[in-house]
């Protein structure tokens, strides 16, 4: 199954996340198919940038979103509006 989820980058105690499309059997940070955005919780307010066209494409071909990505999608839609 293909999933849209967060992959952790950054350094210790300074997380930075990429929003990636990956096979659900892969590890959290490895082997992703495509990077469609990023999430930086360390900025004030938190920064979310997401390519909604690519996200909708992957959802159209059967990808599932994680709970956190679902919440971040709502924030990204508000920022783009």
UniProtKB/Swiss-Prot annotation:
Record-level GO BP terms: translation
UniProt xrefs under InterPro entries: Ribosomal_bS16, Ribosomal_bS16_CS, Ribosomal_bS16_dom_sf
SUPFAM superfamilies, per database record: Ribosomal protein S16
CC annotations in GO: cytoplasm; small ribosomal subunit
Record flagged with keyword Ribonucleoprotein: yes
Family matches, as Gene3D superfamilies: 3.30.1320.10
GO molecular function: structural constituent of ribosome
Domain of life of the organism encoding this protein: Bacteria
Keyword Ribosomal protein applies: yes
Keywords linked to the UniProt accession: Ribonucleoprotein, Ribosomal protein
Family: Belongs to the bacterial ribosomal protein bS16 family.
Designated name of the protein: Small ribosomal subunit protein bS16
Organism: Nautilia profundicola (strain ATCC BAA-1463 / DSM 18972 / AmH)
């Amino acid at each position: 199954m293909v999933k849209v989820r967060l992959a952790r980058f950054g350094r210790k105690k300074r997380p930075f996340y990429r929003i990636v499309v990956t096979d659900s059997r892969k590890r959290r940070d490895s082997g992703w198919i495509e990077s469609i955005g990023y999430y930086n919780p360390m900025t004030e307010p938190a920064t979310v940038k997401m390519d909604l066209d690519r996200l909708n494409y992957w959802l159209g071909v059967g990808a599932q979103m994680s709970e956190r990505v679902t919440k971040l999608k709502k924030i990204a839609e508000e920022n783009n509006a």
